[in-house]
Design a protein with these regions (language model features):
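PLP-dependent enzyme catalytic core of the Aspartate aminotransferase-like
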Residues: 4, 8, 16, 81, ...
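N-terminal small-domain helix-loop-helix segment of the aminotransferase-like
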Residues: 15-107, 416
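Conserved PLP-binding catalytic core of the aspartate aminotransferase-like
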Residues: 48, 321-372
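Conserved core of the PLP fold type I
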Residues: 67-217, 227-246
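Conserved core segment of the aminotransferase class I/II
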Residues: 86, 245-325
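Short Gly/Ser/Thr- and Asp/Glu-enriched loop/turn motifs at secondary-structure junctions
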Residues: 100, 352-358, 382-386
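Generic enzyme active-site microenvironment
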Residues: 221
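Walker B catalytic acidic pair
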Residues: 224
Length: 416
């Protein structure tokens, strides 16, 4: 029996983060054998063609030029007001939904997901997401006494599986009042899949019918961490307008992040943006989440908020920023295209990639295959049902031939 003084709910907690562990192994290998000989497809961060972490110059310049007060001062608990306005503007683009919108600064996109689960479910409740999901969702749920449950994201044709989704939502709705559903789109981590507009229409029609019965509230959480790397600016944002004029029993919360789009991963800045047709529900959203912020991190990194606000407010700076960011989006797309074409050529199965940082190869033997690939200095992430490859971090010269390497490793192990 383990000696412990932890509270019952905390006993036995232990983080097994395969991503950071594998990333560490890749770095150690690169140190020993040279970076150009090691394929590091582990972390969700943009690296350039020389393997260096990218800090957008337009962002760096603005960040380093801030005054001391902006660099080290406290920020308001809800966030710097200019930042919140900029986050809404940049998140929604031309598709800002009609309705009452309230925003709160959060510790990256993760912080918003934490608050949403904490404040809109009861202890013991279940939270729903797709079976291809970012592992932190599960940790956030279990840490606060909730359970993450999943539906099959894809049907046989690799389209959104409406039947599986509806069945799962109905199961939850029968057991609990609030149904919290997390979507990670566009550019889902780990698959790169984006929910199409016609699928959103079906999803929302179904949820409207559900709340019309009068027993449930539905809280839609949308993690848009990869929004800026998933397609044409306005096209990928078009679906936001669908969240206006929904019944008041449906609350939408968009979890927006500066980590990827502004390359400020470790600064931990994002915003949770609530959308409701009912002003009281929108105001409640602001108050309860502000309170939880005070009780969790107190306030958010001021210089990163100010940097983003300044760039978005200045048309000249914003244009330069967008051009620079888009050049990296194009780079990631080119890398993904190399992999996609070569995978098709050798016959390596792959889930439908539309954008974002990652590509996924479905397999039940991810651990064994990833261990086999490490022998060839290839580091990718083993998931429960597949292998995640970070297109954001692998230079083109290393992306070339990678699909074949993975295919051959699977073949050697008899796992195709």
């Amino acid at each position: 029996v383990m000696t412990s003084v932890a509270a019952k709910h905390a006993k036995g907690k232990k983080l097994k983060d395969v991503i950071f562990v594998t990333a560490g192994q890749a770095l150690a290998d690169a140190k020993e054998n040279g970076r150009e000989n090691v394929v590091n497809g582990t972390l969700g961060a943009i690296h350039d063609e020389d393997g260096n972490l990218v800090f957008l110059k337009t962002v760096k310049e603005e960040y380093l030029g801030l005054s001391d007060t902006e660099h080290i001062g406290y920020a308001p608990i809800a966030g710097v007001p200019e930042f919140l306005a900029a986050a809404e503007k940049e998140c929604f683009g031309n598709s800002r939904p009609e309705g009452h919108i309230r925003s709160i600064a959060t510790a990256g996109g993760t912080g918003g997901i934490h608050h949403l689960i904490h404040n809109y479910t009861e202890p013991g409740d279940e939270v729903l997401t797709a079976d291809w999901y970012w592992g932190a969702y599960k940790v956030i749920c279990s840490d606060i006494g909730r359970t993450l449950v999943t539906y099959s994201l894809f049907d046989e044709q690799n389209n959104f599986n409406h039947e599986a989704f509806k069945n799962r939502v109905n199961e939850l709705a029968a057991r609990q009042t609030n149904v919290v559903i997390l979507f990670n789109t566009p550019g889902n981590n780990p698959t790169g899949y984006s929910i199409e507009d016609k699928d959103w229409d079906s999803i929302l029609n179904f949820l409207k019918e559900l709340v019309a019965i009068g027993r449930n509230n539905v809280i839609i959480g949308i993690d848009v961490a990869y929004l800026d790397f998933s397609g044409d600016r306005e096209e990928v944002r078009g679906f936001f307008s669908k969240f206006g004029h929904l019944p008041k029993a449906i609350l939408t919360c968009v979890c927006y992040s500066l980590s990827k789009g502004f390359t400020m991963y470790g600064q931990r800045v994002g915003a949770m943006i609530g959308i409701s047709d009912d002003e009281e529900i929108a105001d409640e959203f602001l108050e309860i989440n502000k309170n939880t912020s005070r009780a969790t991190w107190s306030n958010i990194c001021r210089p990163a908020m100010r940097t983003m606000a300044n760039i978005v407010a200045d048309p000249v700076k914003f244009k330069a920023y967008e051009e620079e960011r888009n050049s990296y989006y194009q780079l990631i797309r080119d890398r993904a295209d190399i992999f996609k074409q070569e995978a098709a050529k050798v016959g390596l199965p792959m889930l439908p990639y539309r954008g974002g940082f990652f590509i996924t190869i479905p397999t039940d033997s991810a651990n064994a295959i990833c261990e086999e690939l490490k022998k060839e200095h290839v580091y990718v992430i083993a998931l429960a049902k597949g292998i995640r490859v970070a297109a954001c971090g692998i230079p083109k010269f290393q992306m070339t031939g990678l699909a074949e390497k993975i295919y051959n490793a699977m073949k050697r192990l008899g796992k195709l």
